[in-house]
């Protein structure tokens, strides 16, 4: 059985998708790369993973580093999963670059280097926005680039984290 739930964040409406056991997607309704899903296949219900997700988001948007993470289940290629795994290690209030993530992936795979563009593609298709902090990835020149939820949201979240670091 598939479930969904709507969350009203300070940055706009978000949709949670998942099962009784896991959160599988969290996204802004208007973001690029939002998953397409058949609404008829989802029951609108507050599940255990969604309750934990709401606690996490409430803490986050109140300027606190969340202390509990919802159980997540990621679907994607091995490459994307490895990028998403690295994203989860970026500390609250800090940033990294696409190139730095590429170097980590290359090292994991025993390669000399990895394309920052390939990393950017995986980052841009992160299924669990905010909790898997793709908004903490910036360009090598320090500029804010490419957040599926929009640059203004990315700036808001980075400013929020910097203020409460």
Give the residues covered by each predicted segment.
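Compact structured core domains
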Residues: 20-69
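DNA-contacting interfaces and partner/effector-binding or oligomerization modules
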Residues: 1-24, 32
